[in-house]
């Protein structure tokens, strides 16, 4: 089995270590390929996104590591790019003109009103307390409205394009499942989720199986209960750890492989000499 990871955060954003530390871990643990995907710049400052001012240094550092470890590991430079709306996403010229090997697109924020500033956003990837307050204040306490907004934004992200991989597709359930009235089994929830899957299938995009929460909570994104639904649509997948610490690079990977096999997958997608290819799940 060939190990690879393409969703990774270092000290250029909210990661907790230098890029080279992740590379060294990957080499020690037999990885064939490793990709960096720092949180992209946003129109506003956050503690977890990198700034545009740091972009050239980020690109240069990953390029340096590519050259230094060329005989030991395939290293790739990507970004995890936030979809905010049709005016700020992976498809805009700024992100398209960057010399990246790949792009992941994810949703962390739901815009509540203009302009695109942090105080006008609902963060779906923060604390439950903040999530609950925003749900009550802006959605009348109706979790269905939040889920609908999330998947509408997800579909707009897929339509906008400009990226290779859908990041943590159903992250809304992380906090949503703690809210009264939410259930992954509910027909209203599955309708929103499946509509998004159908569009991903139509556009031919890859979806990551994100293992970040697996060790602590035994949960994947997309949730393992839905991996068969991806397979039924022949949606290509890869396994990423979304790690922020080097020693967490491999967390949950073997479990994700097992879930994928159970769902009927025979292959995952990997970059091989710069080209996306299917690699056997052995």
Give the ranges of each region predicted by the language model.
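Extended, intrinsically disordered, low-complexity segments
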Residues: 264-282
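Conserved, mostly hydrophobic/aromatic
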Residues: 7, 26, 103, 168, ...
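An N-terminally biased module of ancient metal coordination in phosphate/nucleic-acid-related enzymes
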Residues: 1-85, 89-97, 173-187, 234, ...
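Extended substrate/RNA-proximal surfaces in nucleic-acid metabolism proteins
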Residues: 55-202
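Hydrophobic residues within beta-strands of alpha/beta enzymes
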Residues: 34-36, 103, 166, 207, ...
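Conserved beta-strand termini and adjacent loop/short-helix elements that scaffold enzyme active sites
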Residues: 78, 210-212, 270-273
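Extended hydrophobic/aromatic segments used for targeting, binding, or gating
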Residues: 191-195, 209-243, 251-258
């Amino acid at each position: 089995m060939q190990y690879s990871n393409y969703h990774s955060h270092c000290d250029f954003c909210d990661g907790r270590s230098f890029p080279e530390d992740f590379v060294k871990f990957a080499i020690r643990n037999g990885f064939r390929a490793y990709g960096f995907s720092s949180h992209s710049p946003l129109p506003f400052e956050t503690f977890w996104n990198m700034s545009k001012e740091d972009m050239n240094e980020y690109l240069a550092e990953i390029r340096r590591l590519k050259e230094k470890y060329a005989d030991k590991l395939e290293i790739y430079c990507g970004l995890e790019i936030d979809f905010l709306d049709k005016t700020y996403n992976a498809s805009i010229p700024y992100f398209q003109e960057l010399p990246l090997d790949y792009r992941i697109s994810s949703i962390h924020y739901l815009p509540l009103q203009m302009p695109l500033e942090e105080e006008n956003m609902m963060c779906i990837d923060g604390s439950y307390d903040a999530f609950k307050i925003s749900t009550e204040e802006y959605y009348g306490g109706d979790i269905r409205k939040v889920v609908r907004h999330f998947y509408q934004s997800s579909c707009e992200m897929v339509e906008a394009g400009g990226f290779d991989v859908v990041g943590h597709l159903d992250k809304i359930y992380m906090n949503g499942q703690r809210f009264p009235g939410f259930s992954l089994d509910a027909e209203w929830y599955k309708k929103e989720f499946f509509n998004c899957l159908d569009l991903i299938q139509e556009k031919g995009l890859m979806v990551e199986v994100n293992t970040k929460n697996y060790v602590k909570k035994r949960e994947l994104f997309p949730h393992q209960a839905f991996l068969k639904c991806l397979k039924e649509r022949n949606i290509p997948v890869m396994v990423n750890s979304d790690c922020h610490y080097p020693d967490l690079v491999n967390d949950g990977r073997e479990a994700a492989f097992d879930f994928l096999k159970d769902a009927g997958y025979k292959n995952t997608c990997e970059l091989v000499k710069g080209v996306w290819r299917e690699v056997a799940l052995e």
